[in-house]
């Protein structure tokens, strides 16, 4: 897919605070979040519930999940950079 091509969003449903809700993200984000959850010994649903509980009022859940994936990727890159500088 080229730089200007539209990404396909994939919806997943979760129960958050007793209510069923759907979140639409690109497949790459779902894969990254599933891997992060597994590394922490959680299910994807548990990770989504935790992110939902921490987000600020008015903050979109999909955005919070994307930011988490990006932050974790940046942390990993920083660690790799530190190791390569040693």
Name every feature range the model reports, one short phrase each.
Residues 70-86:
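Short, solvent-exposed charged binding patches
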Residues 1-13:
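A detector of short terminal or domain-flanking linear segments
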Residues 11, 15-69:
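Amphipathic, hydrophobic secondary-structure cores in small proteins
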